[in-house]
């Protein structure tokens, strides 16, 4: 492992030299690529340098212990050696986790899509609950959210919602939410008290910069139409909603949340880029990144990742067998305990693979 870290340090030094060369400075894309690689290496290199410093201090302390005759001083040196050995062991473990393969999208903001699945109106209410939960979670993280498109009604039933979550590390946390979520509860309109089961699907796509993916504009059909949402006379007079159809893949993106046609168009293209990148990545590496269609699935009860059981006040994450209670608290956006457990499980599995 130390040899790998030494190579990281060498590459880090090379990048610092390269990034200052005139021919590199004039290439914006190359500068961006090198800066990202440098940022990815920085924590590893800082840990490795700290490890080397402590290892040298430990060696010096051991040499001092061999030559020191005064017992009081020897006792102090032994204490220092003990502390250094513990610190080195802890740091070695941290470096081991730091060397695990990282998802290159972890630092990115995201586009999240929630769709009601089986279960009629109850599925729409559950999709609304999930949407509110993620908005509250983003608020707790000081991330900003912005709706791109929403298909719902005044009763709080959401058939589909697409929105941005903007903040560093949003993908690293919320990527664990993609999949089919199931709810079991008694609807308010159910007189007999019978428990209903409904589903909603969640897709999480890292946001993609324009320079990361090229879209042939000749392959995109742009339709402009009147918004179906609230908006007063402006909606009646001016068509501002945008529908993009990417003809080679059949992907369709709608955006009608903004009053400005240009803003809706920009948002729609942001979603299209994210979806196209997801499809591209899925072809390159099926193991690392599921395609968007695989994420969304068919919202069927059989392919659930998590169940919210209201009568028993219990959440079960079926991927790792995690059980948590206090659903009202969780739905208020307090997801960190669940996400931390999923992230730790993923790191542990990756570590096994490294062995």
Curated annotation (Swiss-Prot):
Gene3D superfamilies: 3.30.160.20, 3.30.70.1660, 6.10.140.1950. SUPFAM superfamilies: Release factor. GO terms for molecular function: translation release factor activity, codon specific. InterPro entries: PCRF (IPR005139), Pep_chain_release_fac_I (IPR000352), Pep_chain_release_fac_I_sf (IPR045853), Prokaryotic/Mito_RF (IPR050057), RF-1 (IPR004373). Transmembrane segments: none annotated. Keywords: Cytoplasm, Methylation, Protein biosynthesis. Its main location: cytoplasm. The modification N5-methylglutamine is found at residue 233. Methylated by PrmC. Methylation increases the termination efficiency of RF1. GO terms for cellular component: cytoplasm. Disulfide bonds: none annotated. It is found in: Cytoplasm. The keyword Cytoplasm applies. Belongs to the prokaryotic/mitochondrial release factor family. Peptide chain release factor 1 directs the termination of translation in response to the peptide chain termination codons UAG and UAA. PANTHER family: LD18447P. NCBIfam families: prfA, PRK00591.1. This is Peptide chain release factor 1. It comes from Dehalococcoides mccartyi (strain ATCC BAA-2100 / JCM 16839 / KCTC 5957 / BAV1).
């Amino acid at each position: 492992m130390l040899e790998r870290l030494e190579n990281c340090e060498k590459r880090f030094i090379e990048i610092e030299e390269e990034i200052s060369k005139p021919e590199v400075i004039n290439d914006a894309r190359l500068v961006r690529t090198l800066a990202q690689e440098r940022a990815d290496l920085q924590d590893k290199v800082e840990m490795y340098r700290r490890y080397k410093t402590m290892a040298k201090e430990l060696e010096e302390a051991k040499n001092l212990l061999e030559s020191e005759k005064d017992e009081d001083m020897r006792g102090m040196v032994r204490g220092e050696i003990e502390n250094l050995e513990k610190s080195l062991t802890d740091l070695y473990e941290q470096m081991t986790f730091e060397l695990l393969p990282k998802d290159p999208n972890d630092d990115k903001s995201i586009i999240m899509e929630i769709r009601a699945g089986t279960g009629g109106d109850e599925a729409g209410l559950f999709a609304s609950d999930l949407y509110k939960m993620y908005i509250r979670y983003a608020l707790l993280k000081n991330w900003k959210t912005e709706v791109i498109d929403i298909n719902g009604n005044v009763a709080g039933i959401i058939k589909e919602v697409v929105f941005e979550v903007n903040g560093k590390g949003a993908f690293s946390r919320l990527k664990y939410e993609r999949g089919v979520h199931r709810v079991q509860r008694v609807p308010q309109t159910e007189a007999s008290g019978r428990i209903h089961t409904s589903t909603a699907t969640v897709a999480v796509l890292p946001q993609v910069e324009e320079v990361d993916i090229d879209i042939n504009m000749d392959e995109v059909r742009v339709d402009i139409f009147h918004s179906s949402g609230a908006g007063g006379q402006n909606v009646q007079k001016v068509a501002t909603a945008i529908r993009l159809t990417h003809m080679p893949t059949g992907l369709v993106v709608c955006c009608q949340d903004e009053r400005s046609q240009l803003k809706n168009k920009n948002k729609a293209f942001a979603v299209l880029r994210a979806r196209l990148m997801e499809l591209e990545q899925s072809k390159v590496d099926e193991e690392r990144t599921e395609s968007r269609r695989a994420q969304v699935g068919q919202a069927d009860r059989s392919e659930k990742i998590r169940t919210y059981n209201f009568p028993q006040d219990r959440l079960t994450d079926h991927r790792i067998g995690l059980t948590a209670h206090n659903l009202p608290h969780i739905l208020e956006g307090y997801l960190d305990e669940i996400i931390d457990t999923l992230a730790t499980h993923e790191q542990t599995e990756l570590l096994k693979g490294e062995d």
